[in-house]
């Protein structure tokens, strides 16, 4: 009778040992451990003076952060960019009237970023409404209503002239200031004054009268009345105008003369010349303009 082989417990397969802590560390070392985020420096608040300098630097340098840093003087580029981002979002959310420079284009953009002026340059809020007029008696360059020498190859757009004249009406800067350059009564110089935003608010119930800004209602009412057969006394009205309105009428009448001298507007010119006022009132107005110019140049 044969005996069955004896079972030896040592020959049985042993279960794998549990992983040790050293194995876990070796496996985890293959993955990059993310460094915890810590605020190493407390956020610095901006004083009102620093914020005003920041707004002024935006007007001068747009998004040139290095120049803005030099202009502010007490903040780094990182702090300025963070402050600018929050400021731009606030302006966009509130819809306030403020200068937000366009984003800088990429390096290979077709239109590179325009070069800004230096610190010592004036802020670009200043607008000029000076009018240039000829000062000799013959007024070269100024033609009478039917002078054929005024035929030009281009037509000056009245909208362009209007946009130029209205440039001083509303551009309130970041500090609530309106800087207006106005021509002198002689038309040869200019003066500048500053209007605060609070002053504009206080006078909201009254139409603000800014020196150097023409009264466009009076100007265009006068020009329109030249073609009204029921209206007389244009010379007297022109004499009573303020110098700035007088210069504006002169500028627009010259522009109108140039446009109507274009051959494409010959039919319109003939219709206007058929009005009684154009043949009776307008020559006296033109004569007064010439005489006034001669008096100023004397």
Curated annotation (Swiss-Prot):
GO cellular component: nucleus
TM annotation in the entry: none
DNA-binding region per Swiss-Prot/TrEMBL record: 65-88
Domain HTH myb-type: 38-92
SUPFAM superfamilies given in the database record: Homeodomain-like (SSF46689)
InterPro entries: Homeodomain-like_sf, Myb_dom, Myb_dom_plants, SANT/Myb, SANT_dom
Annotated localization: Nucleus
Record keywords: Biological rhythms, DNA-binding, Nucleus, Transcription, Transcription regulation
Region of interest (Disordered), residue spans: 1-44, 96-123
Knockout consequences: Delay and reduction in levels of evening-phased clock gene transcripts, and long circadian period. Under constant red plus blue light, extended free-running circadian period in single, double and triple mutants lacking RVE8 and either RVE4 or RVE6, or both of them. Monochromatic blue and red lights have opposite effects on the period of triple mutants rve468 lacking RVE4, RVE6 and RVE8; lack of blue light-specific increase in expression of some circadian clock genes. In long day conditions, rve468 plants have a larger size and a delayed flowering.
Induction remark: Circadian-regulation. Peak of expression in the afternoon, and lower levels in darkness. Down-regulated by cold.
GO molecular function, one term: DNA-binding transcription factor activity
GO biological process, one term: circadian regulation of gene expression
Pfam families, per the entry: Myb_DNA-binding, RVE6
Function text: Transcriptional activator of evening element (EE)-containing clock-controlled genes. Forms a negative feedback loop with APRR5. Regulates the pattern of histone H3 acetylation of the TOC1 promoter. RVE4, RVE6 and RVE8 are components of the circadian system acting synergistically to regulate flowering time, redundantly to regulate leaf growth, and antagonistically to regulate hypocotyl elongation; their action seems independent of ZTL and HY5.
General remark: Subject to temperature associated alternative splicing producing mainly non-productive mRNAs.
Descriptive protein name: Protein REVEILLE 8
UniProt source species: Arabidopsis thaliana
